[in-house]
Amino acid sequence: MAARIAFYAPLKAPTHPTPSGDRQMARLLVRALQSAGAEVDLASDFRSYDGRGDRQQQQALQAEGRDLAAALIDGWRDLPEGRRPTAWFTYHLYHKAPDWLGPAVSAALAIPY
């Protein structure tokens, strides 16, 4: 069975409309994982970036991330085991764009992060 990888890029998703090096790297990593035989699903396009260091904005993003993680967990738990992710891959952790999804989802589904 091929690995099913939940891919997430909190700074900029590979599907983001604005070109950038981060978007290109995310796309290349997805392709590399697919070339290695993995099935890769974009877990979310949620962007947790706050460039100003605004405490209220960061708290709002954290709360939104917590809600999204809970929804992902519920959705994947409802799927047959063969359709759930077997690993979580986060590209580009950054203090201005933390991963509020991956650790919670990985722990809940007991998959590698």
Regions found by a protein language model. Name each.
Residues 1-48, 83, 111:
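N-terminal subdomain of nucleotide-sugar transferases
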Residues 16-17, 53-55:
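Short acidic, glycine/proline-rich loop/turn micro-motifs
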Residues 22, 65-69, 95:
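A conditional alpha-helix N-cap/helix-loop micro-motif detector
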Residues 33, 105-106:
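A generic structural signal for well-ordered alpha-helical segments
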Residues 47-51, 59:
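Extended, alpha-helix-rich binding/interface surfaces that flank or overlap catalytic cores
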Residues 57-78:
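Glycine-rich, highly charged phosphate/nucleotide-binding loops
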Residues 76-97, 111-112:
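Short N-terminal targeting/anchoring amphipathic segment
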Residues 100-104:
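A short acidic, amphipathic alpha-helical/loop segment
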